[in-house]
Amino acid sequence: MSQRQFKVIIIGGSVTGLTLAHSLHKIGIDYVVLEKRDTVTPQEGASIGILPNGARILDQLGLYEAIEDEAPPLGATRIHFPDGFAFTSLYPKRMRHSFGYPIAFLERRQLLRILYDALPDKTRIHVNKTMSTIEHFTKDEITGARVLTKEGDVYEGDLIVGADGIHSQTRGEIWRRINSSKSAFKTAEEYSCCFGISKCVTGLIAGEQVMHMRNGRTLVVIPSKDEVVFWFLVEKLDRKYTYSEAPRFTIDDATALCSQVFTLPIGNNIKFEDVWNKREVVNMLSLEESCLSTWSTGRLVCIGDSIHKMTVNLGQGANCAIEDVAVLCNLLRNMCQLKSGTRPTEQEIDLLLRRFNKQHLSRVTQITNMSKLTVRVHARKGVLHRLVGRYVMPYFGAYFEARPFNMLADAASLDFIPLPKSSYPGWEKYSSKTRGNSRLLPLMFTLPLLYFGLSWIVGIYWKPGYLHAWNS
């Protein structure tokens, strides 16, 4: 068999795709990135949060210092409720002290620029290349896969990775090959999100986030450096939609929604209307919630938003995708080392991708489920979520934050690069290897805590007519 170097074709110049490019470079695997737009740094009005699980991998790749320069760390969150109660959560500060990395928000375009600028060979990035067809081929005793673009170009390689987002063409090709259908894409769209970036907003403190948890909606405002403010407003839709029937929104829809929260205070005598009036870019879309169980077939695999999609509240969408990259690259590196320069067969690649799917699915499912819970607590969906948000979080928040800390501590990383900041206590303290895998013990403590906590709440706050006022 020919000794031609193993090559990966990456569909999509996304955060996921560019992170994969950096990781492949580290292990000496040839690659090419195909992006359908005319730039890999488009302005979409979106911010992105980098949390410790994603930050650690980016730090391994030598990319995190540039992110730190752009994004002031979150130190606290001021959380407001409909009844006028508010409290300050130091969850972001405790996260940084535990894991060494803060919650850092920056423009998605800024992160894409950082990833692109740091690439050692930008000639591997091809814009204006829209995938048209994927074929398997045999040529001169060499087998592989090729991508044909609508522009008439042909790219050949051994593995095709779809990092092309929620509307993934690569995923569609996988479905076609396994005789599946779009009905298998069991995404639910129960919430919408209007998000934007405002500039020249004076009077707010960088790194002090503000959240309003209302009935059916959540407003989050994140002041950053240089008087830039990131914000998003999540709204519960009138019903649950499927992927194909989800509503589309206009700027008029965004304006109408945001006008309903103009009077909400952000701090220092600033209302949300003041932030809205300084907007630079605004967008609105429905939020998908999904986690596919099948990610690959043959020489094709999907990662990132093309296989798992979450709402913005937990901030794990990009971070989970970065973990996808780490798990896949660890397996690819091991395979290439075992082959000692001989290109793997299609059967060997297919087996590796199935192993990737099986190994990482439970982790992705865990994060997706936590994201689903978070958006519903923030939007106060139903009595239980309202009780947790209003009466458990303010008083027992430090106890219940152990669950997301457990999730962070069990994050994947690149196993061939030393771990930075591994001396921070949270990575070991909250790891499943340290705490064990038993779910019974946490439950034994959690249920009594909820019982006595809710009994205390009812005893203090219950009075005739109170429940009606609380639900309004």
UniProtKB/Swiss-Prot annotation:
Q: How does it sit in the membrane?
A: Single-pass membrane protein
The answer on whether this UniProt entry bears the keyword Transmembrane helix reads: yes
What are the UniProt keywords, alphabetically? FAD, Flavoprotein, Glycoprotein, Membrane, Monooxygenase, Oxidoreductase, Signal, Transmembrane, Transmembrane helix
- Pfam families in UniProt: FAD_binding_3
Q: What does this protein do?
A: FAD-dependent monooxygenase; part of the gene cluster that mediates the biosynthesis of the diterpenoid pyrones subglutinols A and B. The first step of the pathway is the synthesis of the alpha-pyrone moiety by the polyketide synthase dpmaA via condensation of one acetyl-CoA starter unit with 3 malonyl-CoA units and 2 methylations. The alpha-pyrone is then combined with geranylgeranyl pyrophosphate (GGPP) formed by the GGPP synthase dpmaD through the action of the prenyltransferase dpmaC to yield a linear alpha-pyrone diterpenoid.
Give the family per the record. Answer: Belongs to the paxM FAD-dependent monooxygenase family.
What's the protein called, per UniProt? Answer: FAD-dependent monooxygenase dpmaE
Q: State the organism of origin.
A: Metarhizium anisopliae (Entomophthora anisopliae)
| Gene behind this protein | dpmaE
